[in-house]
């Protein structure tokens, strides 16, 4: 469930940030900022639904998913295929996120 939640949060965050990127860097219509803001609010709300006990741990685990999702965005939306270094870095980050997320923390 955590990975699905983080995946949805990543889609909302990346979409929201890309709306700002589109306006400020690509000269798109400023009306794109409204759905961008809504998307960023949805992202923040989704991240609070995490089962993690501490916010910092949720953010750290989410970070790996965000990186992988950003590379999917790069490929599917921006039309640039991630290279082997992108993929290697994403795998390292996902491994770290898995350790943070699924580690047994019982005493």
Curated annotation (Swiss-Prot):
Domain of life of the organism encoding this protein: Bacteria
Record localization: Cell inner membrane
Keywords, comma-separated and alphabetical: Cell inner membrane, Cell membrane, Membrane, Transmembrane, Transmembrane helix
Transmembrane segments: 1-21, 26-46, 58-78, 87-107
Main location: membrane
One GO cellular component term: plasma membrane
UniProt topology in membrane: Multi-pass membrane protein
Coiled coil location: none
NCBIfam families, A to Z: PRK02237.1
Entries under HAMAP family matching the protein: UPF0060
Family: Belongs to the UPF0060 family.
Protein known as: UPF0060 membrane protein glr4174
């Amino acid at each position: 469930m955590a990975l699905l939640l983080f995946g949805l949060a990543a889609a909302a965050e990346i979409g929201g940030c890309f709306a700002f990127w589109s306006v400020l860097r690509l000269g798109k219509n400023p009306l794109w900022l409204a759905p961008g803001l809504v998307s960023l609010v949805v992202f923040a709300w989704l991240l609070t639904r995490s089962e993690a006990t501490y916010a910092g741990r949720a953010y750290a685990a989410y970070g790996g998913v965000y990186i992988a999702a950003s590379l999917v965005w790069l490929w599917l939306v921006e039309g640039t295929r991630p290279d082997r270094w992108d993929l290697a870095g994403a795998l390292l980050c996902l491994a770290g996120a898995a350790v943070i997320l699924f580690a047994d923390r019982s005493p």
